[in-house]
Swiss-Prot record:
Its main location: cytoplasm. Its EC number is 1.3.1.98. The lineage of its organism: Bacteria, Bacillati, Actinomycetota, Rubrobacteria, Rubrobacterales. Belongs to the MurB family. One of its GO terms (molecular function) is UDP-N-acetylmuramate dehydrogenase activity. It comes from Rubrobacter xylanophilus (strain DSM 9941 / JCM 11954 / NBRC 16129 / PRD-1). This is UDP-N-acetylenolpyruvoylglucosamine reductase.
Length: 297
């Protein structure tokens, strides 16, 4: 859609913008139009306008757990992580906009003596992405603390609880409705000792730093297979260091696929499929991707 329509409809957007600049994997072709709304109202207006003119909409959060294909994304891409970070605390309830960063929420609530989100320090993503994926770490997950989320669906804002959202392991009903958009979410917390909570966060942060590679990756590539861990399975299959193009199975943690510099989405997808095939052949284990793939080849 390069006939000037997008420029007329969304003058505040960036056009033909390389999305590798906005993803943790440093991979991704161009967005026809990339909009970073400064308010929820601007977001609502953009989605409504896109719908009226038949412009497809893709929403990105913090760029983790997502692979943008090399052909980029057609239509309008909306990135939430830049501005939609509003947060409000009322008693033991936290309400955060979709672009708020999970580690920031973990630190903020811990410092105020509110427990429940310490696990979020290990999730380098946004509220919107965390609800979409039911993100979790260190024995907890979003579903355990989520009260509700406001979802833009079919032109209306609908408040949905955890059951309505169908939260399960790294999944929600949002996977089946790519046009739905998380606007904000509320969390039920409980009192805790600030120093104890901060110490727990420090421990989680140390675990993450020691167990994660220092090269660009999307985070966890595959979901946990029943009764096991994907990193252990991939390592047991002898696949650490396996490489396609500039994408490599990390030698630090085998469930992280790292970009050595200049890697492409096609490299990443080929490596993911190769790892799945070899794990299946050698160990009889079926790995399911955790990463969300968007865009065109």
């Amino acid at each position: 859609m390069h006939d000037g329509t997008l420029q007329r409809l969304f003058p505040a957007a960036k056009f033909d913008e390389p999305l590798r600049r906005y993803t943790a994997w440093k991979i991704g072709g161009p967005a026809d139009a990339l909009l970073e709304p400064s308010s929820i109202q601007e977001l609502l207006s953009a989605v409504e306008l896109a719908g009226e003119h038949g412009v497809p909409v893709t929403v990105l959060g913090g760029g983790t757990n997502v692979l943008v294909r090399d052909g980029g994304i057609r239509g309008l891409t909306i990135r939430l992580a830049k501005s939609l970070r509003g947060v409000k605390l009322s008693g033991e309830t936290l309400v955060a906009e979709a672009g708020a960063l999970y580690p920031v929420l973990a630190n903020m609530t811990a410092s105020r003596g509110l427990a429940g989100l310490e696990f979020a320090t290990g999730i380098p993503g946004t509220v919107g992405g965390a609800v979409f994926m039911n993100a979790g770490a260190y024995g907890s997950e979003t579903a355990r603390v989520l009260l509700w989320a406001d979802i833009l669906r079919d032109g209306r804002v609908v408040r949905m609880g955890p059951e309505e959202l169908g939260l399960s392991y790294r999944r929600s009903i949002l996977h089946d409705h790519p046009g739905w958009v998380v606007l904000r979410a509320a969390y039920r917390l409980h009192p805790g000792d600030p120093e104890d909570l901060r110490e727990r966060i420090r421990e989680f942060r140390t675990l993450r730093m020691n167990g994660s590679p220092n090269r660009p990756s999307c985070g966890s590539t595959f979901k946990r297979p029943p009764g096991d861990f994907p990193g252990r399975v991939i390592e047991a299959a002898g696949l650490k260091g396996l490489r396609v193009g500039q994408i490599e199975v990390s030698t630090v943690h085998a469930n992280y696929f790292v970009n050595l510099g200049g890697g492409t989405a096609s490299d990443a997808l080929r490596l993911m499929e190769l790892v799945r095939e070899r794990v299946r052949e050698r160990l009889g284990v079926e790995l399911e991707p955790e990463v969300r793939v968007v865009g065109e080849p």
